[in-house]
Amino acid sequence: MKRDIHQWISDYGVSHQNPINKKIHWICVPLIMFTLLGLLSLVKIYNVNLAYLIIAFALFFYLRLSTPISIGMFIISATQLGLIFYIEMLFLDIHLIYIYLLTFIIAWVGQFIGHKIEGQKPSFFEDLQFLLIGPAWLISFIYKKIGIKY
């Protein structure tokens, strides 16, 4: 059975009930996304950075599930890519790969600490697509708060 966005969000939420784990996710999920895009932006394929290609595939995934979620993810992705571009312009002489990688690792350690507190394995152990659902899960809370149906 194909899952809709509500089923994905609900299934993801099962292992994200603990308030501390939720708070950790609000910090670590955006950091993981940002640092992953930062790392991917350093990889160029025919003068196109890999982050753009990965975002295109991710947005297609979101669009198949929910137009409002895909719009939110587009805005977040574009904002993060813009910030990454700005950082890369400012710090040409600094090896950003090490900063991105260290932050990426620290954010993942935070995620695993949150799941240890939760007493549940991360959702992506069940299905790798949950790695894309984490950011959408956060957006769903924002949308509910401001009354946007997704």
Where are these regions (language model features)?
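Membrane-proximal soluble regions of multi-pass membrane proteins
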Residues: 1-15, 19-20, 116-150
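Hydrophobic, membrane-inserted alpha-helices
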Residues: 31-37, 53-61, 77-84
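Hydrophobic alpha-helical transmembrane segments
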Residues: 52-56, 70-75, 97-102
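Membrane interfacial helix-start motif at the N-side
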Residues: 9-30, 36-40, 59-69, 117, ...
